[in-house]
A protein has these predicted regions:
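Beta-sheet-rich non-transmembrane sensory/scaffold domains
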Residues: 1-165
Length: 165
C-alpha cells in the first residue's frame, strides 16, 4: 500500500517490471458516480455451450445505494450493476449469484432466466457462492460479502438454507 498525499488515502500500487511506472487499481466512475460506459452495467447471460447460442440475458443487480438520491432516481432497473463474482448452478437447475452491488443473493431458473428468489445480504456479494450439504441432508448456499475496496464495505460470510422439495 502507498499513500496518495494529495487525497490523503492509501492505494494499492503494483510495480510494472521493466518500466519506471506503477499502476493504481481503482474503479473508473464519472463525477456523478456512474460507470463511464453506456448501460447495461451488468447482466447475467446463459449460453448453450454446444451451439454457442445465447439462451437468455437478464439485468444483474442495481447500484442506486451508491449514488446521491437525485442521480439514483434516474437509474433504470434494466441497467444492472457492475459486479465482482460469478454464479454457481445446482443440480436442480438453479443459478445462484450475488456479485452485484445491490446486497442480494439472487436465484434464477437456468432454463428461463426468471428470478426465483432473492435473499438479503449485509453488503455486496463480491465472490462466487458455494453450495454444501450437511450430514442431516440439508443443503446451504453460502457467499462471502463485503471485502472493503473501492466501496468501503465490511466482511461477512452469509449462508442460506435451501428448501427441500
Amino acid at each position: 500500500m502507498a499513500e496518495d498525499k494529495r487525497l490523503g488515502r492509501d492505494y494499492e500500487y503494483n510495480g510494472m517490471r521493466g518500466t519506471p511506472y506503477i499502476m493504481r487499481r481503482r474503479i473508473l466512475l464519472s463525477p456523478s458516480g456512474m460507470p463511464c460506459t453506456p448501460p447495461p452495467f451488468g447482466t447475467l447471460v446463459a449460453v448453450d455451450l454446444k451451439t454457442g447460442k445465447r439462451l437468455w440475458e437478464v439485468p444483474l443487480g442495481a447500484f442506486t445505494r451508491l449514488l446521491p438520491a437525485e442521480q439514483a432516481a434516474k437509474v433504470r432497473p434494466e441497467w444492472g450493476s457492475p459486479n465482482l463474482g460469478g454464479p454457481i448452478v445446482t443440480a436442480g437447475g438453479v443459478v445462484f449469484i450475488g456479485a452485484a452491488l445491490d446486497r442480494w443473493l439472487h436465484a434464477y431458473d437456468i432454463e428461463t432466466g426468471r428470478e426465483l428468489w432473492r435473499g438479503p445480504l449485509p453488503e455486496s456479494g463480491k465472490a462466487t457462492p458455494m453450495s454444501y450439504q450437511v450430514p442431516s441432508g440439508e443443503q446451504f448456499v453460502a457467499i462471502a460479502v463485503g471485502g472493503g475496496g473501492a466501496w468501503g464495505a465490511g466482511d461477512y460470510v452469509v449462508a442460506f438454507r435451501l428448501k427441500s422439495e
